[in-house]
Amino acid sequence: MLSELFNSLASFFSNIFSLFEGKKETRILMIGLDGAGKSTLLYKLKLGDVVSTIPTIGFNVETIEYKNLSMTVWDVGGQHKIRPLWKHYYHGSNAVIFVVDSTDRERMDEVKEEIDNLLIQDELKGTQILVFANKQDMNNAMNTAEIVNSLDLNSIKDRKWYVQPCSAIRSDGIYEGFDWVANSLNNK
């Protein structure tokens, strides 16, 4: 009986202290090839609406409060000439979100090459990777199994990874993907 009372009090105080703890600061790097929908996805999550976007030259940065996290999301342009600059955003990243255009089958080899390059970066060692398989609202979108196979994701053994099908335009799958990121960061 005494131990039950002690456990109840411990749980009570733990819950009280968590209220004052605040949100855990995290840094998320959002990258992907040009036209994948990175900015659309970011602003759909931030503003709850689809905004008109133009190709990102450089980066967009937004802070998003999600669950117990304060996520600073760096959305970096994906044009071929900009990709060498991605390395300048690696430092301090807690997670990488790689947005893929699920309808762009011709560029999956290029996506795989970029993901493989991320996996060998010292500054990203152990950093989890969420692959948003975007544009699932389109008829010719690749499903999750096709994305996993095309990118050979099952060969990744040194970190957590997850593929979340989504449609940035319709908000489908966005919150589920960020749930995975939040849960993974909290269990790290």
From Swiss-Prot:
Specify where it is mainly localized.
Answer: Golgi
Q: Which residues bind GTP?
A: 34-40, 75-79, 134-137
Q: Name one GO cellular component term.
A: cytoplasm
Record keywords:
ER-Golgi transport, Golgi apparatus, GTP-binding, Nucleotide-binding, Protein transport, Transport
Q: Which InterPro entries match?
A: P-loop_NTPase, Small_GTP-bd, Small_GTPase_ARF, Small_GTPase_ARF/SAR
Subcellular localization is given as: Golgi apparatus
What domain of life?
Eukaryota
Q: Which GO MF terms are attached to this record?
A: GTP binding; GTPase activity
- GO biological process entries: intracellular protein transport; vesicle-mediated transport
Q: Which Pfam families does the entry link to?
A: Arf
Belongs to which family?
Belongs to the small GTPase superfamily. Arf family.
| Primary role | GTP-binding protein that may be involved in protein trafficking. May modulate vesicle budding and uncoating within the Golgi apparatus.
Cite the PANTHER family for this sequence: ADP RIBOSYLATION FACTOR-RELATED
According to UniProt, the name of this protein is ADP-ribosylation factor J
Organism annotation = Dictyostelium discoideum
